[in-house]
Amino acid sequence: KNKIKLFVTLSFALLMAFGNVNSVSAAKSTTKSTPYGTLKGFISPYNSGSSKLCEGGTTIGQNVKSIKIKIEAKKTSTGTNIGSTQNQHANSSGVGDTLECWGYTGTKVTFYGTHDAIHTTGYHVYTSTQY
């Protein structure tokens, strides 16, 4: 009986550990210190219906006097620009910008700028700031 219990317990543990292999992976992030607080960059693949989409962004969680956040994305294989966003923030708290890529199921997308690379399967994100 103890062997059966152990087998069931181990089987359940393995299922929990590896059962989500095909699901969307968790967001990856990195941080960078700025004069106005810590900048966080992230990349997050996610599902919407049957399409695998991606989202990249930068946020800063403290009051800022002035900061410009820019995010750009290109399809890795061809270099095709698939979107960009850039916003200037002043006297704001918890500012941030995100960029979503729609309709690029199964492709590699590169988010790029000038700082802090984040790498995850098939995606790269770089956060970029000017202040």
Where are these regions (language model features)?
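N-terminal prepro-regions of secreted/extracellular proteins
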Residues: 1-48
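Short, exposed beta-strand-loop hairpins at the edges of beta-sheets
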Residues: 60-63, 102-131
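Short, surface-exposed binding/anchoring microloops in extracellular/periplasmic proteins
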Residues: 29-76
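Solvent-exposed serine/threonine-rich low-complexity stretches and specific carbohydrate-binding patches
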Residues: 79-94
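Generic detection of short hydrophobic beta-strand segments and adjacent strand-loop junctions
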Residues: 28-34, 87-90, 103, 127-131
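Exposed aromatic-hydrophobic patches
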Residues: 93-104
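A positively charged, amphipathic N-terminal helix/segment that binds anionic biomolecules
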Residues: 68-70, 78, 114, 129
